Amino acid sequence: MSSYVGVLVSDPWLQSQFTQVELRTLKSKFVSNKTQLGRFTVGDLPPVFEKLKAFNGTIDEDEIKSVLDKSYPNADDEVDFEFFLRAFLSVQARGVEKSGGSKGASSFLKTSTTTVHHAINESEKASYVSHVNNYLRDDPFLKSYLPIDPATNAFFDLVKDGVLLCKLINVAVPGTIDERAINTKKTLNPWERNENLTLGLNSAKAIGCTVVNIGTQDIAEGRPYLVLGLISQIIKIQMLADLNFKKTPSLFQLVDDTQDAEELMGLAPEKVLLKWMNFHLKKAGYEKQVTNFSSDLKDGEAYAYLLNALAPEHSTHVALETKDPTERAKKVLEQAEKLDCKRYLSPKDIVDGSANLNLAFVAQIFQHRNGLTVDDSKTSFAEMMTDDVETSREERCFRLWINSLGTATYVNNVFEDLRNGWVLLEVLDKVSPGSVNWKHANKPPIKMPFKKVENCNEVIKIGKELRFSLVNVAGNDIVQGNKKLLLAFLWQLMRYTMLQLLRNLRSHSQGKEITDADILNWANRKVKRGGRTSQADSFRDKNLSSGMFFLELLSAVEPRVVNWSLVTNGETEEDKKLNATYIISVARKLGCSIFLLPEDIIEVNQKMMLILAASIMYWSLQQQSDTESTVSEDATDDGDANSVAGEISNLSIDGASESSPTVQDQELLTKADNDEDEVDGENNKDA
């Protein structure tokens, strides 16, 4: 492994806010000031921050002091490095807000890892508010607060308690949140409000939103650029939901051969939308190619051709004959109204080239009339799609997990986007800082196949250094898109990350390795100490399908979080589904960042059961760290009080390393390797 050791931060969310270069720079500033001052306090921060290049004169010392006073009123509080980083983020947010978000444009189109830099204009705000008014107007709880006036800040006030956020997520991806878990009283206390916001943010991650720079406090304070940046992502996911082949098989009409079909399946939804638009424009005689949702649509001509092609019954040449762009845009929107497309944008937005609103408008046209038919001659393309439900479900889980880490590259399809090795290197650098030697990495776009192999060989090399089970696996397997091997690698990577998080809670583990058995033992002991009777023999225990064990575990770590009047006995399939859905929402409400589906619990997916239990364990132990508890919650049966450190260290059964491959890992990789050998017995792999 590279001798370089990155700057480590115990809080993974905080770690994700900075690059290693930024962390090293800030660490150096922190250490030098602490050395110079001896005792580094909140009161010492303003002059230190003012001199940082990151702020470059955008915010002065008095303003910095004002920002810090709101969050940290006691100027005598001593500052540690993580405190220093959090304070830096608070000041940075104020600086960006002051400059009008000049560091970057709105990222409704591009998924940026730096949501703090969103700058939403008033037109976009009005469109998002209109969207909320339209889709949530009949909601039993929210209807008394709607419609919202976009000319006021009422929207930012309404979003503060988290209810609207949760409801909008369920509109975008129905069933994501069990609404029984949402606190919906007229007046919520701070705890209940924070639960809703935590549920909302963790659920946003679970549908594909990038929220690495957004915390519950940001939403509770109603910070406009952060709130609208998140809302825009949720709306984008809703608007593009049908841009895939499972929901719209007729999209195969856009391709001519197998290679085109494979490429289209790997495209981001917005790219598919552009391809769809160009497909119809070409048929309509439009000679240009639309490559973006901004400048290429400014003159309104492409819209006029598109609507004439999709709705010949409303066809008119008036828009095309109109010379003034604004007048043409008006005619386009009038024609769209006849298709029942509610206006996401104004004529001015078209002329100005508002990428976000144009994307939403084109997506809405697609939803109302896509102009495609099922072509029997292309049914073979549909057969290319995986029928393996488990594989599809795992791909979804790993894709969402990777995107939640805040990597620079957004993943739309695991099996396509990871084949050049670059994203895997980004993920490895996130979960094991300093493990990647970037001098040996090839950055996309990569045209030469051997460069992709080099990246993937580096991925395998690092995986072996992290003690993953990678027997007979070579970088070329990833490049070739071996699904089973890739999923097996990603599972080990996710498991390694979770176990490292637990291990890094040194006040509990004393730096000792954590095993799968430790997690199971901890969960069983926790449930027993909570006065409940459920126990799990393993993470394959079929009794887990009822959901009772995890509900009792959640109740044991936080008694108030489970409403037992909503829990079923879990005997029928319907009852199991109700419990499983509730478990996921309650865990997210508690603070667990998880990506499983109810089916994973009902079918007892061993891997997801381990991650769920580990996530609950991590949350529980974090709370003990925060309160600096010195007495173990899991005292031994004879009543002796153990140290908190003993809660984990005394659980060890076999002393195995957390990164040693499990039997399941070996089975997965052996099976995947054998399957590959059947396909290509002559493929030589590196040991």
Swiss-Prot record:
Q: What is this protein called?
A: Fimbrin-5
Following inactivation of the gene, the phenotype reported is: Delayed pollen germination and inhibition of pollen tube growth due to the disorganization and redistribution of actin filaments.
The misc remark on file is: Cross-links actin with a constant of dissociation of 0.71 uM.
One GO BP annotation of this record? pollen germination
Coarse class of the primary localization is cytoplasm
- InterPro entries noted in UniProt: Actinin_actin-bd_CS, CH_dom, CH_dom_sf, Fimbrin/Plastin
Q: Which residue range or ranges hold the EF-hand domain?
A: 7-74
| Keyword terms | Actin-binding, Cytoplasm, Cytoskeleton, Repeat
Tissue expression, as annotated, is: Expressed in mature pollen.
Region Actin-binding 1, residue ranges: 122-370
Where does this protein reside within or beyond the cell?
Cytoplasm, Cytoskeleton
- Function text: Cross-links actin filaments (F-actin) in a calcium independent manner. Induces the formation of actin bundles. Stabilizes and prevents F-actin depolymerization mediated by latrunculin B (LatB).
Q: Where is this region: Disordered?
A: 628-687
Q: Which SUPFAM superfamilies match?
A: Calponin-homology domain, CH-domain
Output the Gene Ontology terms for molecular function. actin filament binding
Residues of the Calponin-homology (CH) domain = 122-239, 267-370, 392-498, 513-621
What is one Pfam family matched by this protein?
CH
Kindly indicate whether the keyword Ion transport belongs to this entry. no
- Specify the domain of life of the species encoding this protein: Eukaryota
The beginning of the lineage is: Eukaryota, Viridiplantae, Streptophyta, Embryophyta, Tracheophyta
Ranges for the region named Actin-binding 2 are 392-621
